[in-house]
Curated annotation (Swiss-Prot):
Quaternary assembly: PP2A consists of a common heterodimeric core enzyme, composed of a 36 kDa catalytic subunit (subunit C) and a 65 kDa constant regulatory subunit (PR65 or subunit A), that associates with a variety of regulatory subunits. Proteins that associate with the core dimer include three families of regulatory subunits B (the R2/B/PR55/B55, R3/B''/PR72/PR130/PR59 and R5/B'/B56 families), the 48 kDa variable regulatory subunit, viral proteins, and cell signaling molecules. Interacts with IER5.
Highest taxon of source: Eukaryota
UniProt keywords, alphabetically: Repeat, WD repeat
SMART domains, per database record: WD40 (SM00320)
WD repeat ranges, renumbered to this chain: 22-61, 87-128, 171-209, 220-260, 279-317, 334-375, 410-446
Record's protein name: Serine/threonine-protein phosphatase 2A 55 kDa regulatory subunit B gamma isoform
GO molecular function: protein phosphatase regulator activity
Taxonomic lineage: Eukaryota, Metazoa, Chordata, Craniata, Vertebrata
Listed Gene3D superfamilies: YVTN repeat-like/Quinoprotein amine dehydrogenase
Length: 447
């Protein structure tokens, strides 16, 4: 496995409107577009920051992989639901890019209740020489127009414009936890705790309810939906995960309401490991189809698992993310960390998987060699071009000089959100209000 990841740290920068140290600046989602040229982050303040990859220059070959701010905009504002007397916070829960179909880029962003479709366009020319309007766009006095001229386009400084194209509201009673764009490029789905809705990208005033697990009596509720995703190639298939650790694969061709799943993926519980925390730590916090569409990756509190779509009985691979926390579940329950929702990601060839942990650590697992590594995203360890050193957490006994004791882990520093470039070994790591971009120098080790 290539461990030679070096970094570009996109820290808090003075003078940037999105970069003051407040809770609103905590990054809540990270997403590459389909080419990897753009990277979007959303934060708790309802803002979206888009980074663009710099073209490689002959003078500075190391600049490949550098991402700089491309555009910043306010996606959501705080609202108040007067019917339920509830505040709706502006925090961006998820961002999903639409496949690019013309010169413009489009993305979906959502908070707890409202999904918005945004269009991002570039302008580097402006029209001049209108017959009936002056340079400021005001209508001229027709008596002063004595000749006709052909308007021309003049070069201007590049301007990135972000405009809202659609607002999809009133589709969810509960908090939206995931959105996923279908491979048909016309529809997408959104999931909350109890329901999944199917939307058409061009229609905002109605959606189709495709999953509803709400019981007639809420006292009978035993599980909630935690994440959902469309299959990357088959537009009729989607999966959703639950707080009980199960995955349900659904086929929209079978029925309009997919309450009856096509396949149920569930690992039988080992009775010897049963404890008060068993159900909490088995809750799936993220599910991702592999790029090939053959596998699914899930993250629960202590592990990441790879499932084969053709085998429902158990995962084909299980990787321990931080098994040393198993003895600390009691204190993690008391400080609510046990409810943290970690995401997971595939690399472009589905051979390596990545997920976050505590103490600003993140983990990588090579599926072919079965090797794994723990790396750290922090200002100290991530000076530009510095090679990341593998970190090790030790539980009692002898300790090497660079090892960190499990008792000195900082649980306030957690990496929940990660993203992997769709084709190259470039990863984006959100560590509270800092974004780190790491790139593998060898760039072929993980392919």
């Amino acid at each position: 496995m290539g461990l030679s990841f070096f970094s570009k740290h996109l820290p808090i920068q003075e003078g940037q409107p999105w970069a003051s140290k407040t809770p609103a600046d905590i990054i809540s989602t990270v997403e590459f577009n389909h080419t990897g040229e753009l990277l979007a982050t959303g934060d708790k303040g309802g803002r979206v920051v888009i980074f663009q990859r710099e073209p490689e220059s002959k003078n500075a070959p190391h600049s490949q992989g550098e991402y700089d701010v491309y555009s910043t905009f306010q996606s959501h504002e705080p609202e108040f639901d007067y019917l339920k007397s509830l505040e709706i916070e502006e925090k961006i829960n998820k961002i999903k890019w639409l496949p690019q179909q013309n010169a413009a880029h489009s993305l979906l962003s959502t908070n707890d209740k409202t999904i918005k479709l945004w269009k991002i366009t570039e302008r580097d020319k402006r029209p001049e020489g209108y017959n009936l309007k002056d340079e400021e766009g005001k209508l001229k006095d027709l008596s002063t127009v004595t000749s006709l001229q052909v308007p021309v386009l003049k070069p201007m400084d590049l301007m990135v414009e972000v405009s809202p194209r659609r607002i999809f509201a009133n589709g969810h009673t509960y908090h939206i936890n995931s959105i996923s764009v279908n491979s048909d490029c016309e529809t997408y789905m959104s999931a909350d705790d109890l329901r999944i809705n199917l939307w058409h990208l061009a229609i905002t005033d109605r959606s189709f309810n495709i999953v509803d697990i709400k019981p007639a009596n809420m006292e009978d509720l035993t599980e909630v939906i935690t994440a959902s995703e469309f299959h990357p190639h088959h537009c009729n298939l989607f999966v959703y995960s639950s707080s009980k650790g199960s995955l349900r694969l659904c086929d929209m061709r079978a029925a309009a309401l997919c309450d009856k799943h096509s396949k149920l993926f569930e690992e039988p519980e080992d009775p010897s490991n049963r404890s008060f925390f068993s159900e909490i730590i088995s809750s799936v916090s993220d599910v991702k189809f592999s790029h090939s569409g053959r596998y699914m990756l899930t993250r629960d509190y202590l592990t990441v698992k790879v499932w084969d779509l053709n085998m429902e009985a158990r995962p084909i691979e299980t990787y321990q993310v931080h098994d040393y926390l198993r003895s600390k579940l009691c204190s993690l329950y008391e400080n609510d960390c046990i409810f943290d929702k970690f995401e997971c990601a595939w690399n472009g060839s589905d051979s390596v998987i990545m997920t976050g942990a505590y103490n600003n650590f993140f983990r990588m697992f090579d599926r072919n060699t079965k090797r794994d590594v723990t790396l750290e995203a922090s200002r100290e360890s991530s000076k530009p071009r510095a090679v990341l050193k593998p970190r090790r957490v030790c539980v009692g006994g002898k300790r090497r000089r660079d090892d960190i004791s499990v008792d000195s882990l900082d649980f306030t520093k957690k990496i929940l959100h990660t993203a992997w470039h769709p084709a190259e070994n470039i990863i984006a790591i959100a560590a509270t209000n800092n974004l780190y971009i790491f790139q593998d120098k060898v760039n072929s080790d993980m392919h």
